[in-house]
């Protein structure tokens, strides 16, 4: 298929659609067909075709079988090309396969619109015209101007800017799910779109914007009054900060926090953004961002685990959480501490920082009868493994030979394990030995 030739045909799609509409109106078609034509004219950003239909009393508020109004269609991304095929085969079947392939790679939220377009054009066109009409057009800069003009026409006809489709999405949801929808979002907000409205799944426009990873779009919504603690999903109770952290987007997470997002907010299972960041080895900067902005390192989710439980496989994460006061002796609902919950104890570097922390905490108590239950469990675990016992003895010797003021981050690494392990930068809030 000659992709260049097909793209060249695309330039005529506006005039073809306009002629179809003129002929269709003359034939007095059903309301359903006129409604499809309006959606298609809007999807292709054909302002003259839209005006022609509305001037002939086509209802701009009419919805399709998916609950989509013409305003929803407008705020969805314009058609764009996804596939290039090298071999040209001049028959309609191949053309249709090309469209199907492109549909499969399109966003499902609006792919059905193109299916209806295909059916409609096959009713009105000759076979040799199908390829011209079905070719998916590229987005041109002028289209953005047409989008605003079309929206103004629709709004002047009284269309409800907050009308929901069959899954509760408004036009603003769709516009925020579209990386190039900045002008559309601004115009919707200017005309009264509800910024914090949720769809049937508890997703807000801000959550859609966060998912697109477009910080400019997120900033527009926050500056316009979007709730930084708004919902991403009502089924599991996640908020937009969970989504930003889960996708590893530092800049958006920072923007949300600076706008008032709560770093300790939990989902239905009590999982906080800090729990989420602690799991992902690539989210160290996010972990530090959350801790710097008041995230509680000892907050528990419904199963009793803290972020330290999720971070125990990673030395740097454990070190960072200890710096901010994470408690190694907390016990979860299964009776485990973060240390006893480990599957193995083969990582000597990780063992060194954990056991030193445990030994420092033990030093705070003059009598075993006052040991916290979690500390007892951790000490029992150490005693049951020879390599852990050897590490504990070295830590005890280090602590015994040092004064309280000397047990600080940069002074212990060269002495523990004969400089074998790099503990530079480590410090503990529990190092205040009396």
UniProtKB/Swiss-Prot annotation:
Write the signal peptide boundaries.
Answer: none
- Tell me the domain of life: Viruses
Q: Where are the ANK repeats?
A: 33-62, 134-163, 167-197, 201-230, 236-265, 269-299, 303-330
Q: Per UniProt, which keywords does this protein have?
A: ANK repeat, Repeat
Q: Which InterPro entries match?
A: Ankyrin_rpt (IPR002110), Ankyrin_rpt-contain_sf (IPR036770)
What's a Pfam family this protein contains? Ank
Q: PROSITE patterns per the record?
A: ANK_REP_REGION (PS50297), ANK_REPEAT (PS50088)
> Membrane-spanning residues where?
none
Q: What is this protein called?
A: Putative ankyrin repeat protein FPV023
Identify the species of origin.
Fowlpox virus (strain NVSL)
